[in-house]
């Protein structure tokens, strides 16, 4: 804020300096959809900080709902020689459903699972990447060490022999599936097929059993970064429901249904241990049946149009049917099929 005093500050007898980074700005009033990876390809230190501790307080990918930014920012911090970085800020569970604390930021494991997994990966990147090591320019530096980020896939990925983490569905195969001890996921992967929309954690115990922790499905009801957030209007809802999970690992192939909680898989048997595990009490937000849908901006003539919508209900959803009417009054009905979490999809034929 006072760049004309920077030389005097850095020349003083101080132990270190702090910096911050908001590459997408602050308080845009809406979610930012642009690709910001080029903007975080490098972090340029504008001042002479030789011989001083370098600390980041604070940083965030503000107003970005994607899950691809945090590891890239961690990479650039380490390249610039930073030794400490603090993300701003984590939303308490009771407030995350409203995002009223400071709406340009939104981070919570339950309500923003993809972003939370991305931050988990970024923490690992910051700890493991060498200070001062560069990885080239964008897009070549989208893969660095054990890590990969992708705007197109909305993905942060860590692929290591014992640790495999992904913020969204990926087809990238683990480098050593037989050695895996920890999996942190959101979406699906070659080793975990899951049709819920919450985060999950799989940890191999010393006795060979697996501890499985699963979080609720979540759906956004409005732009969480808007200027109208209030305590009487929830920007996201969570719901606990049984979902199918399939695990495909050497020595462990299993197919079962789980609801949010903690489980132990041992010798071919799944046991719920939520009560003993200290799992947080998560109250469902879904109180009535509702549909949340963002209309497509454009459709290609003659091609099938895929329509997606989130359908929530406190009761089990039996079926979802899309009713439509074309120009000049031609009506049609198309059945919608469940995908992950609350999402249902239908393809409208292009010849309608």
Model-predicted segments: where are they?
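C-terminal beta-strand-rich structural cap/linker in extracellular carbohydrate-active enzymes
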Residues: 245-285
């Amino acid at each position: 804020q006072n760049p004309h005093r920077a030389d005097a500050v850095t020349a003083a007898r101080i132990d270190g300096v702090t910096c911050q980074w908001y590459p997408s700005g602050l308080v845009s009033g809406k979610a930012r959809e642009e690709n910001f990876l080029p903007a975080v390809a490098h972090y340029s230190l504008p001042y002479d900080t030789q011989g001083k501790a370098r600390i980041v307080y604070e940083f965030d990918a503000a107003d970005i709902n994607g899950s691809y930014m945090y590891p890239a920012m961690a990479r650039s911090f380490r390249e610039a020689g930073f030794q400490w970085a603090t993300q701003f800020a984590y939303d308490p569970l009771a407030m995350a459903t409203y995002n009223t604390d400071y709406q340009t930021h939104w981070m919570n494991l339950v309500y923003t699972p993809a972003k939370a997994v991305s931050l988990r990966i970024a923490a690992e990147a910051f700890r493991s990447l060498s200070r001062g090591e560069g990885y080239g320019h964008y897009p070549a530096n989208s893969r660095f060490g054990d890590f990969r980020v992708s705007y197109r896939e909305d993905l942060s990925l860590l692929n290591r022999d014992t640790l495999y983490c992904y913020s969204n569905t990926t087809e990238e195969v683990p480098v050593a599936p037989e050695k895996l001890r920890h999996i942190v996921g959101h979406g699906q992967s070659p080793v975990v097929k899951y049709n819920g929309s919450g985060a999950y954690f799989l940890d191999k115990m010393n006795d060979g059993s697996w501890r499985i922790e699963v979080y609720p499905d979540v759906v956004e009801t409005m732009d969480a970064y808007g200027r109208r957030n209030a305590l009487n209007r929830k920007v996201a809802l969570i719901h606990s429901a049984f979902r199918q999970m399939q695990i495909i690992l050497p020595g462990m192939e299993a197919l079962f249904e789980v609801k949010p909680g903690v489980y132990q898989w041992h010798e071919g048997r799944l046991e719920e241990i939520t009560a003993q595990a200290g799992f947080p009490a998560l109250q469902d937000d879904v109180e009535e049946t509702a549909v949340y849908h963002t209309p497509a901006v454009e459709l290609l003539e003659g091609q099938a149009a895929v329509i997606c919508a989130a359908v929530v209900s406190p009761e089990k959803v039996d079926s979802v049917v899309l009713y439509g009417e074309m120009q000049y009054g031609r009506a049609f009905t198309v059945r919608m099929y469940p995908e992950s979490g609350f999402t249902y999809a239908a393809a409208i034929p292009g010849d309608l």
